[in-house]
């Protein structure tokens, strides 16, 4: 019996939840956000079903820019793995992205997920970026002096940051991409201006970064610094947590360079390697 792929519907959310609860050691998030995804423009959620029309696979594709698509949230019911659903959903998502103007489709995989890496390479993807997902709790040491701390920056600061970053090894390692949480697309000068307007663009003698706050801490999407200045920037990032309530944590997506991982680990960050794969359409 062959499975078919169709667009997801609101009633599929409750049917997907039981077999996605143990995807990771901490659970899963897809059933909590899938309902919202169904209503997002430029986004498609698909499911795999058999004759009973009960979802046993799911995936999402979305346009992050007019020419860039991102594929994520691929899940297959444990009893239906190795059935070809993963590759079939990927192909379906890629076709949808191409029809909607995308010229490249990308996705992220943790470096130690050999099965997923093998699958995307067989599908024609190539490795286009190595990143570090870095997390840390609030610093317990001395707070930085006023002149060393991160503070909100303005348009002039963003201009300097962009000029510096565009010529840096961080930009080269990032392939000029910016993190949108667990999604990536090509960065633009406008991203920094948006951050200035949202009061999420910060500067210090150690460099510049975009840091967004939520109920659990701070998330860093983009940063610009140099090897000698990186320690001060990272210290300043942890220092920002002192102004957050509860027991906040900081998470940062940082391109892998010859020095970036060491700078993070020296300041107590736990680092998980992430790889970005892309497919030209």
Locate predicted features:
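Conserved acetyl-CoA-binding loop-helix of GNAT-fold acetyltransferases
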Residues: 76, 82-95, 118, 122, ...
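Charged, low-complexity intrinsically disordered regulatory/assembly segments
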Residues: 174-281
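Conserved beta-strand in the GNAT
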Residues: 54-62, 70, 75, 203-213, ...
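Conserved active-site tyrosine of GNAT-family acetyltransferases
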Residues: 119-121, 125, 262-265
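Active-site rim helix/loop that mediates acceptor-substrate recognition in acyltransferases
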Residues: 13, 20-47, 55-60, 169-201
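Conserved GNAT acetyl-CoA-binding A-motif
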Residues: 97-112, 119, 245-255
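Conserved catalytic-core motifs of GNAT/GCN5-like acyltransferases
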Residues: 63, 108-110, 126-140, 270-281
């Amino acid at each position: 019996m062959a499975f078919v792929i169709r667009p997801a519907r609101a009633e599929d959310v409750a049917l997907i939840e039981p077999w996605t609860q143990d995807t990771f050691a901490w659970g899963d998030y897809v059933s909590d956000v899938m309902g919202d995804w169904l209503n997002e423009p430029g986004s498609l959620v698909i499911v795999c079903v058999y004759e009973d029309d009960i979802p046993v696979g799911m995936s999402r594709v979305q346009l992050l820019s007019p020419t860039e698509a991102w594929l994520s949230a691929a899940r297959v019911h444990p009893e239906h793995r190795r059935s070809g659903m993963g590759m079939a959903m990927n192909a379906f998502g890629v076709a949808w992205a191409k029809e909607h103007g995308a010229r490249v489709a990308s996705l992220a995989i943790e470096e130690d997920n050999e099965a997923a890496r093998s699958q995307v390479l067989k599908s024609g993807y190539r490795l286009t970026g190595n990143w570090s997902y870095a997390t840390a709790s609030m610093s317990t040491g001395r707070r930085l002096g006023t002149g060393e701390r991160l503070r909100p920056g303005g348009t002039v600061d963003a201009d300097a940051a962009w000029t510096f970053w565009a010529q840096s090894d961080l930009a080269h390692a990032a392939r000029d991409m910016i993190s949108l949480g667990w999604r990536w697309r090509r960065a633009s000068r406008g991203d920094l201006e948006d951050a200035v307007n949202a009061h999420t663009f910060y500067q210090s003698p150690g460099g510049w970064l975009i840091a967004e706050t939520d109920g659990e801490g701070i998330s860093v999407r983009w940063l610009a610094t140099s090897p000698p200045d990186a320690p001060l920037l990272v210290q300043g990032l942890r220092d920002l947590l002192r102004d957050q309530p509860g027991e906040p944590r900081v998470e940062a997506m940082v391109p892998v360079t010859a020095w970036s991982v060491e700078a993070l680990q020296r300041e107590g960050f736990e680092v998980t390697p992430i790889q970005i794969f892309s497919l030209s359409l």
